[in-house]
Curated annotation (Swiss-Prot):
The keyword 4Fe-4S does not apply. Component of the acetyl coenzyme A carboxylase (ACC) complex. Biotin carboxylase (BC) catalyzes the carboxylation of biotin on its carrier protein (BCCP) and then the CO(2) group is transferred by the transcarboxylase to acetyl-CoA to form malonyl-CoA. Its main location: cytoplasm. It comes from Pectobacterium atrosepticum (strain SCRI 1043 / ATCC BAA-672). GO terms for biological process: fatty acid biosynthetic process; malonyl-CoA biosynthetic process. This is Acetyl-coenzyme A carboxylase carboxyl transferase subunit beta. Residues 25-294 form the CoA carboxyltransferase N-terminal domain. Belongs to the AccD/PCCB family. Its cofactor is Zn(2+). Its EC number is 2.1.3.15. GO terms for molecular function: acetyl-CoA carboxylase activity; ATP binding; carboxyl- or carbamoyltransferase activity; zinc ion binding. It is found in: Cytoplasm. A zinc finger (C4-type) spans 29-51.
Length: 305
């Protein structure tokens, strides 16, 4: 018997039991490292309540938060990717597709829905970054064109949320063709005078940034989103110079006039609805469901800065 056991009366010792906390209840902010309650983070649309860092959001979660709850219809869900080239690098392309579909629970890297935004008819496309880095390939291009065609048929606006590493190398030239294909489709929107708003989220790179992501009548970015063609590391290695702080981030781009505005995610739904109301002569929506943190910088304070 140890000396401590001799001192303490065993009847006063209460055995402790290890707490059993289910997995996935807590998560950590990628920016500030703060441990966060996942349910609270989801209520805040993936925005850290401590530092306002905008974490990556799945395509369906983004669409569900953006559109009205009623009357949403998914478009192009029957389109599935095929390994036409029988491509293989370190792994077969068809095996990569199966793995990506299991990981993301999506058939490909874009989800398209039509519905309403504050009662206004609208078509919305959103990239799924969890599917092979949101890379643009044949199905992504086909679904985006389907979104454009639906907007033309309904005579309504189109909004696209981009989150992509660029063109998918496993589809080679066919993936590069989607840059021209999507750009040509958007030209029809412009001919009809229908608004197209592009929302650039972290990251929007490569062939996506060089085509549909930067062709909006208004180009909006989320705070601190990485936006560009080649990545900063590649550029530094090429030009052999140190890049300025914040290079290719949305705050840097708005200073250079490359984008039109920066909008926080909780305010995105109301802001886009207000802009579309002005562009389409619809009545402006009420802002009852806008969530604005008192300790976060507002859009007006960003402008003043």
């Amino acid at each position: 018997m140890s000396w401590i056991e001799r001192i303490l009366n065993k009847s006063n010792i209460t055995p402790t039991r290890k707490a059993n906390i289910p997995e996935g209840v807590w998560t950590k902010c990628d920016s500030c490292g703060q441990v966060l309650y996942r349910a609270e983070l989801e209520r805040n649309l993936g925005v850290c309540p401590k530092c306002d860092h905008h974490m990556r959001l799945s395509a369906r979660a983004r669409l569900q938060a953006f559109l009205d709850k009623e009357n949403t219809v998914e478009l192009g869900s029957e389109l599935e990717p095929k390994d036409v080239l029988k491509f293989r690098d370190s792994k077969k392309y068809k095996d990569r597709l199966v793995s990506a579909q299991k990981q993301s629970d999506e058939k490909d890297a874009m989800v398209v829905m039509k519905g309403t935004l504050y009662g206004m008819p609208i078509v919305v496309a959103s990239f799924e970054f969890a599917f092979m880095g949101g890379s643009m390939a044949s199905v992504v291009g086909a679904r985006f064109v389907r979104a454009v065609e639906q907007a033309l048929e309904d005579g309504c606006p189109l909004v696209c949320f981009s989150a992509s590493g660029g063109a998918r190398m496993q589809e080679a030239l066919m993936s590069l063709m989607q840059m021209a294909k999507t750009s040509a489709a958007l030209a029809k929107m412009r001919e009809r005078g229908l608004p197209y708003i592009s929302v650039l989220t972290d990251p929007t790179m490569g062939g996506v940034s060089a085509s549909l992501a930067m062709l909006g009548d208004l180009n909006i970015a989320e705070p601190k989103a990485l936006i560009g063609f080649a990545g900063p590391r590649v550029i530094e290695q090429t030009v052999r110079e140190k890049l300025p702080p914040g290079f290719q981030r949305s705050e840097f781009l708005i200073e250079k006039g490359a984008i039109d505005m920066i909008v926080r995610r909780p305010e995105m739904r109301y802001k886009v609805a207000t802009l579309l109301a002005k562009l389409t002569n619809h009545p402006e929506p009420g802002n009852d469901d806008v969530e604005i943190r008192s300790d976060a910088p507002s859009e007006s304070s960003q402008d003043d800065a």
